[in-house]
Amino acid sequence: MKCLKAAYIREEIQIPDKVKVSLENNVLKVKGPKGEVIKDFSYAKGIRIQLNEGKIILETTFADRRKKALLYSIIAHIKNMITGTINGYRYYLKVISTHFPISVKVSGDEVQVSNLIGEKNIRRAKILPGVKVTVKGEDIVVEGSDIYNVAQTAANIESSTKIVGYDRRIFSDGIYIYKKEVIGLEQSD
C-alpha cells in the first residue's frame, strides 16, 4: 500500500527567554548563556523555516515519508541547539590502562595520548571548535554548547586509542566514553 502524502505540516518550537535566535538564508544562529551554535539547513529542500513572535516555525507541503523524517530531524537539531546554548553538554571518558600507564594531556586544539601499551609514538585526537577538554587524573571531561562537536571530540579521543592486532579481551587499554549528560540536568547521586 502506498503511503499518503500529508498536504501540509506545520510545527512550532517555542524560543526560551534566555535565547536569541536569528535566521538568514536557512542558516540558524542560536545564542544563549553557554555560547552560540550555528547550523546550516540549506540542504533541506522543501522545508520552510521562519521566525515569528518568539517561535521557530517549520512548514512543508506534500510531505512524503522522507520529507517528514527530514522535518522532524531538523526539529531535533534545533531543540539540541537550544538546549546546548542554555545548559551545555558534557561527556565523560575514562583512561583504562592495565599494562602501561597512559599519559594524556591537552595541547592546543588536540589531545595527546602517549605510552599506550608501551608505544613510543604520540597518538593525537582533534578538539573541535567550541569544545573544552579537561584531564583530571584518569577522567577526561569534554564539554561545550554544540552536542555534535562535543560528541565528535569525545569520539576522536576514544578512537585515537584503538588498538589493532591485539586481543581486546586482554589488552583493554584505551580511553572510553562512560557517561553523557546535559549540564544542569545531571542526577544527584
From Swiss-Prot:
<dbReference type="Pfam" id="PF00347">
    <property type="entry name" value="Ribosomal_L6"/>
</dbReference>
<protein>
    <recommendedName>
        <fullName>Large ribosomal subunit protein uL6</fullName>
    </recommendedName>
</protein>
<dbReference type="InterPro" id="IPR036789">
    <property type="entry name" value="Ribosomal_uL6-like_a/b-dom_sf"/>
</dbReference>
<keyword id="KW-0687">Ribonucleoprotein</keyword>
<dbReference type="InterPro" id="IPR019907">
    <property type="entry name" value="Ribosomal_uL6_arc"/>
</dbReference>
<dbReference type="GO" id="GO:0022625">
    <property type="term" value="C:cytosolic large ribosomal subunit"/>
</dbReference>
<dbReference type="InterPro" id="IPR002359">
    <property type="entry name" value="Ribosomal_uL6_CS2"/>
</dbReference>
<keyword id="KW-0699">rRNA-binding</keyword>
<dbReference type="InterPro" id="IPR020040">
    <property type="entry name" value="Ribosomal_uL6_a/b-dom"/>
</dbReference>
<comment type="subunit">
    <text>Part of the 50S ribosomal subunit.</text>
</comment>
<comment type="function">
    <text>This protein binds to the 23S rRNA, and is important in its secondary structure. It is located near the subunit interface in the base of the L7/L12 stalk, and near the tRNA binding site of the peptidyltransferase center.</text>
</comment>
<dbReference type="GO" id="GO:0002181">
    <property type="term" value="P:cytoplasmic translation"/>
</dbReference>
<comment type="similarity">
    <text>Belongs to the universal ribosomal protein uL6 family.</text>
</comment>
<dbReference type="GO" id="GO:0019843">
    <property type="term" value="F:rRNA binding"/>
</dbReference>
<keyword id="KW-0689">Ribosomal protein</keyword>
<keyword id="KW-0694">RNA-binding</keyword>
<dbReference type="InterPro" id="IPR000702">
    <property type="entry name" value="Ribosomal_uL6-like"/>
</dbReference>
<dbReference type="GO" id="GO:0003735">
    <property type="term" value="F:structural constituent of ribosome"/>
</dbReference>
